[in-house]
């Protein structure tokens, strides 16, 4: 079974999940069939937890740690004394095995890569690569970027510019182990570490070298560079694997170690950074105000109030809600790096790091196991999530109203027959009037007495034609209800007086004319052919009348251009106007009468009031006289 240390907080969503906090150690962890989830034991309870919230703890040398004190107790020989002398009085039990542990870790975990292409750093935390350089790989920071050491410098470099070498041979590992023993176990270079390692058999063989180093005092001869290199890489590796279990160094140290160790501690402290996910405006003086994407130096997570962290931003210290930010490492505080070369394409896509801070801002709905695929996408550890989730509820844009579908307008109906208005009531009666015209052509021309001398015999002809065509008109009267007749009614609407109809005098007729008109027009043409004869017979009379009364002749010509239908419409219109004028006059006269009556009534009321006022004055004067008499009588008595 493997143990894991928690790097990010996680709140359990289901009963079979564990609630974990940063720094806790989960025991007896095993992988599950479901990708992205592990199962382990914490505080006596076993459950599931996401694998990207924890980090594996290498426990390869732990079994030997328990045997270490037993060996030292049993030995009781010069070797234990040499260990005490080499550390100048420091307890050797807790310090001595670490160089061996580091050597063993190098043997099992050491990764190296060779530079294939030159690379110039674009940021301060990047390494400069030259073809042929060998880099000690520490960890994979994010997809396409690794962290490693080159020439005593720790930094980032693109993974697609290097090629990973195979693990070093055992001989090389042992040589590295022996080299590390000399500087690290000498009198001036003990280095404590959080983990406990064991002292294997080769360690006891290397002890005489320590004695020689103490005796001659020149243990750093030709090894100063190796000391710095080995110390930097090993300490950085320890920092990566056992970061939460940092212990304070015991005893005095050499100047060289004191210079390097604070640097490592500083790097560890510098990892306490967090990136803001959402903008926040402080409501109190001790709160920070920040925008999205800013980097806050995390000072403390323990502020005495749950859900609040203490940090520093732009030189100001204050508290801020932890669900508005996500913790990142120092190497990621400059993320994103747009100028870096694109990382090579890899199979599994990185998944967003669903930390507890993000979960508080927008809780995950992981009730369904299908949605746990969000956790299955592992982020590049310990980088911040590359795809930040949606922000908390923002004043929205909305939210989002449903767009109503476009109104479907009904099909435009055909234009109906206009209802007969009072002034245009004749339009609806054209068919009836037309039949009346045929039956009563004599009555309408008689309205104008000046028209009779012009056509003295046409009256009899029209009456004759009307009598002959009456039966035909009655038979075809039912055809008027057709659609053609409706259109015909609109086409033959009465025109203005003084305008001649094109169908009457030009010889043409509308194709939509009713059967009555088609029968009537030829007969009228026949009557028109007879009119010249009538004019010749009464030429003298017509000339005299035209000379004597030129105005009447113009009236006759105007009346000749009007059809009986138009004459009737004109007469009715004139009658309507006259009636309306008469009604208005009657109303005005009635109003005047009413006003006069009101004036009379008002005058009568005023007279009554005046009389009453005079009477009241007289009564008052009488009362005053009587009161005066009474006063005199009272005074005299």
UniProtKB/Swiss-Prot annotation:
Changes after translation: Phosphorylated on tyrosine residues; probably by c-Abl, Fyn and c-Src.
GO MF terms, alphabetically ordered: actin binding; actin filament binding; clathrin binding; identical protein binding; phosphatidylinositol 3-kinase regulatory subunit binding; SH3 domain binding
GO biological process: actin filament organization; actin filament polymerization; adipose tissue development; apoptotic process; cell differentiation; cell division; cell population proliferation; cell-cell adhesion mediated by cadherin
Region (Disordered): 166-209, 226-254, 333-455, 488-555
Location of the protein in the cell: Cytoplasm, Cytoskeleton; Cell projection, Ruffle; Cell junction
Coiled-coil boundaries: 578-636
Gene3D superfamilies with a match to the protein in the record: SH3 Domains (2.30.30.40)
Keywords on record: Cell cycle, Cell division, Cell junction, Cell projection, Coiled coil, Cytoplasm, Cytoskeleton, Isopeptide bond, Mitosis, Phosphoprotein, Repeat, SH3 domain, SH3-binding, Ubl conjugation
Residues the record lists as Phosphothreonine modifications: 563
Gene Ontology CC annotations of this record: actin filament; axon; cell cortex; cell periphery; cell-cell junction; centriolar satellite; cytoplasm; cytosol
Disruption phenotype: Death at 6 to 7 weeks of age from renal failure. Mice show defects in epithelial foot processes, accompanied by mesangial cell hyperplasia and extracellular matrix deposition.
Basic and acidic residues bias: start-end ranges: 166-177, 356-379, 437-449, 517-539
Domain of life of the native organism: Eukaryota
Chief location of this protein within or outside the cell: cytoplasm
Pro residues: compositionally biased ranges: 341-351
Motif SH3-binding boundaries: 336-352, 378-397, 410-422
Tissue: Expressed in podocytes (at protein level).
Bridged cysteine pairs (disulfide): none
SH3 domain mapped to chain residues: 1-59, 108-167, 269-330
InterPro entries: CD2AP_SH3_1, CD2AP_SH3_3, CD2AP_SH_2, Endophilin_SH3RF, SH3-like_dom_sf, SH3_domain
Annotated spans, Interaction with ANLN and localization to the midbody: 1-175
Domain remark from Swiss-Prot or TrEMBL: Potential homodimerization is mediated by the coiled coil domain.
SUBUNIT field: Homodimer. Interacts with F-actin, PKD2, NPHS1 and NPHS2. Interacts with WTIP. Interacts with DDN; interaction is direct. Interacts (via SH3 2 domain) with CBL (via phosphorylated C-terminus). Interacts with BCAR1/p130Cas (via SH3 domain). Interacts with MVB12A and ARHGAP17. Interacts with ANLN, CD2 and CBLB. Interacts with PDCD6IP and TSG101. Interacts with RIN3. Interacts directly with RET (inactive) and CBLC; upon RET activation by GDNF suggested to dissociate from RET as CBLC:CD2AP complex. Interacts with CGNL1 and SH3BP1; probably part of a complex at cell junctions.
PANTHER family for the chain: CIN85 AND CD2AP RELATED, ISOFORM J, SH3 DOMAIN-CONTAINING
Function: Seems to act as an adapter protein between membrane proteins and the actin cytoskeleton. In collaboration with CBLC, modulates the rate of RET turnover and may act as regulatory checkpoint that limits the potency of GDNF on neuronal survival. Controls CBLC function, converting it from an inhibitor to a promoter of RET degradation. May play a role in receptor clustering and cytoskeletal polarity in the junction between T-cell and antigen-presenting cell. May anchor the podocyte slit diaphragm to the actin cytoskeleton in renal glomerolus. Also required for cytokinesis.
Protein name: CD2-associated protein
Origin species: Mus musculus
Gene (name only): Cd2ap
